Amino acid sequence: MKKILVKNQVEGGKVAFELLKESLTAGAQTLGLATGSSPIALYQEMVESDVDFSELYSVNLDEYVGLSPEHDQSYHAFMKAQLFDTKPFKESFLPDGMAEDLEKAAKDYDDVLAHHIIDLQILGIGSNGHIGFNEPGTPFDSQTHVVDLTDSTIEANSRFFASRGQVPTKAISMGIASIMAAKKIILFAYGDKKADAIFKMLKGPVTEEVPASVLQNHPDVTLILDQAAAAKL
């Protein structure tokens, strides 16, 4: 696992964009994308570049259950605002959090992933070690599934909503096995609230109680960290 220490998120975005361009040069067809604050600087680099993404596919990690794609806090809306409105892809896939049959929606998303093998997956990490919305205890062999969000995740996401009570309590997320199937992974971590999770991910045992620890078993992971996130290493 390669570690790159950066001064801030802006520098992290630039470093990640160079790695992304290397993947494109090597023939990448499908990008795995993430939401949250960590990848925004990368998306800004993509938007400001002259790189054409219109022949590429994208798949996103997750989506809240119960938020329409038009809701300003849905991950559909996030991706449109941060990237897709300016840099459209040939086709962009996100889980359907409004589906009447959520289990079928999860299975349908597995079918998408089977047809679009991820060449480069972007990840953040939760303070509890989650990747995607795969909370502690998620089986390592999990595929796309419906998730009950933990209190810590709901609390962390409440800053984006008018009140904690408006935060969705469920999501559809790519599973850990789905993430591990990506050929290459870039994980961002910024700030002291991520320091414990980064330490456990890298130095602790590989355990389902720290979902990100499974990345120790992946052949091609690059961590982009600031000093605060790397403080306990």
Curated annotation (Swiss-Prot):
Top-level taxon: Bacteria
InterPro entries (alphabetical): Glc/Gal-6P_isomerase, Glucosamine6P_isomerase, Glucosamine6P_isomerase_CS, NagB/RpiA_transferase-like
Catalytic reaction annotation: alpha-D-glucosamine 6-phosphate + H2O = beta-D-fructose 6-phosphate + NH4(+)
Enzyme Commission code(s) on record: 3.5.99.6
Record: active site: 62, 128, 130, 135
Family statement: Belongs to the glucosamine/galactosamine-6-phosphate isomerase family. NagB subfamily.
Full protein name: Glucosamine-6-phosphate deaminase
Pfam families to which the protein is assigned, alphabetical: Glucosamine_iso
GO biological process, one term: glucosamine catabolic process
Gene name tied to this protein: nagB
This protein's GO CC annotations: cytoplasm
Keywords noted in UniProt: Carbohydrate metabolism, Hydrolase
Gene Ontology MF terms in the entry: glucosamine-6-phosphate deaminase activity; identical protein binding
Function: Catalyzes the reversible isomerization-deamination of glucosamine 6-phosphate (GlcN6P) to form fructose 6-phosphate (Fru6P) and ammonium ion.
Pathway listed: Amino-sugar metabolism; N-acetylneuraminate degradation; D-fructose 6-phosphate from N-acetylneuraminate: step 5/5
